[in-house]
Amino acid sequence: MQIYGIVKPDKKGEYDMKKITCMLLVGLLIFALCACSQNNQSAMYIKPSDFSEETQDVLSLFDDEIQFFDISFDETAKSYAVSIWVYRDGEWFEDGTTAGNIDHVTGRIAVRLTETGCDLYTIDENGHVKYSFPTVDTPFDESTGVGGTRIDREVPIMLNKEIPLWVRIGTTANSMRVLDITDDFRNTECNAGVAVTLTVSDVEVDAK
């Protein structure tokens, strides 16, 4: 389990930093694509990707904003959906989702979660696709404390069961309960929050 706080970014040189960040992301995605390989395990699971020490040093520049996950499927898995859940006005809302049919045994996804938005990358042997959710409508700016948790170990995938990948919570209370990624984030007391979840289904989705 990883628990962390949010540090407000320094606005000086923000434009140059955005260009550097984009270049680093492109390099990381190319490396992730090359490193994506077949796995002989038959059980379905998702886990944090393993990278070399040099690549981990590059990832550290993103200040815990991005995480790569390796996924293994079996023949029962037909489709997947990744959803963005946002807490506002006392309720959790599904603000966005991306779904597709599964045509490969292994894959990799990357999630970049910031205080204001979320980017999702799906990566396989054919390349990568980016999905952007540029606005997260939840009042983190009103929170006195922000923390979160994300997958830090191998987690089994069960068909048609939602798996939280990354949860970030804000609170105005004097203390915050320690979260585990297996907890139901919807039961957490908070004033702001965003969660990224994965659901694998045994039914194909309609192509659009």
Residue ranges with predicted function:
Residues 99-208:
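Extracytoplasmic electrostatic interaction patches
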Residues 1-16:
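Short, Lys/Arg-enriched N-terminal segments with co-localized hydrophobic residues
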